[in-house]
Amino acid sequence: MAPKAEKKPAAKKPAEEEPAAEKAEKAPAGKKPKAEKRLPAGKAEKGSGEGKKAGRKKAKKSVETYKIYIFKVLKQVHPDIGISSKAMSIMNSFINDIFEKLAGESAKLARYNKKPTITSREIQTSVRLVLPGELAKHAVSEGTKAVTKFTSA
């Protein structure tokens, strides 16, 4: 997105001032200069020197979130309650934060014990270290239950 005409950088080079001066001469007094025609994003002119193949769409970056899982848990606990997008974003950030803390603590534990692999034991210990009291106990029991279910299936 191009900056507005009113905003000017503190120090301009002489080469940057010339195109702006040319545009000002072309436009009649009191009228805005006409916008240049632009092609839709991803479509280049035939004569342009871009190395992209014509007709290819730009791939979207996939952003992984916990939103669908948060929503599923919410509906299990309170089927009649919804959640705003801002609250969902906060919950997603919260889960990412807890995940990073647990992963960091697990990595430290593996390094201390000179082990190359993070196992369920390191995860369980890091949960006990990161989460407080009763919350850690419930998290450990739910985690153990999930691992048992996964290995038996």
Swiss-Prot record:
Keywords: Acetylation, Chromosome, DNA-binding, Isopeptide bond, Nucleosome core, Nucleus, Ubl conjugation. Disulfide bonds: none annotated. Gene3D superfamilies: Histone, subunit A. Core component of nucleosome. Nucleosomes wrap and compact DNA into chromatin, limiting DNA accessibility to the cellular machineries which require DNA as a template. Histones thereby play a central role in transcription regulation, DNA repair, DNA replication and chromosomal stability. DNA accessibility is regulated via a complex set of post-translational modifications of histones, also called histone code, and nucleosome remodeling. There is a cross-link at K149 (Glycyl lysine isopeptide (Lys-Gly) (interchain with G-Cter in ubiquitin)). Belongs to the histone H2B family. The modification N6-acetyllysine is found at K7, K37. Can be acetylated to form H2BK6ac and H2BK33ac. Monoubiquitinated by BRE1 to form H2BK143ub1 and deubiquitinated by UBP26. Required for heterochromatic histone H3 di- and trimethylation at H3K4me. May give a specific tag for epigenetic transcriptional activation. This is Histone H2B.4. Residues 1-61 are annotated as: Disordered. GO terms for molecular function: DNA binding; protein heterodimerization activity; structural constituent of chromatin.
